Amino acid sequence: MNVPKYDAIFMIGPQGSGKGTQGKRLAEKLGYFYWEMGGILREEAKKSTPFGIKVKNLIDAGKLLEDEELFRVLQTELPEVIKHKRILFDGVPRTVPQGVHLIHYLQQNGFKDFGAIHIDVPKEESVKRLLERAHHEFRTDDTPEKIGFRLDLYESETKPVLKFLAGMGDLYTIDGVGSIEEIENRIDSVLNI
């Protein structure tokens, strides 16, 4: 198996695209450290700290953290994360300022080669998957109204990140409709693994 040249890979896609599932599988296959922003924030939301309460309220409302607040999380987490020389980031960056901040930090710490995998899924498919997830897992951010709001945020704030990431390294857009295995095979194919 060929291992990609990337020091960091970013999994980008709307909620319900399967980026978490595919990111975990890819990280395990390649020996990358898997780091998921959503999981970090859900853990933070369980804490009774002022920041934890704020994060919980934002998650419950289906909203995203402001960039400055996310930078605070990154500054806390990244010194430990970058000890791993190959990292797969899931769920970050979600805005161009987050991308600039994260890439700059990584470059300052010796990371040079970046790849991004954009899992492209139609809005209707994302909604269907998220409603199904809400039925099986209790997620306060998976109601129809909050799903619609988050997918609109993805279109307005996260999609522009794709152009930024393409300028920083390689960007691969993958059709995210199909079985887990079909999507995994598409990713493997574009990465030549």
Predicted regions and their residues:
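Glycine-rich phosphate-binding loop of ATP-dependent small-molecule kinases
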Residues: 1-193
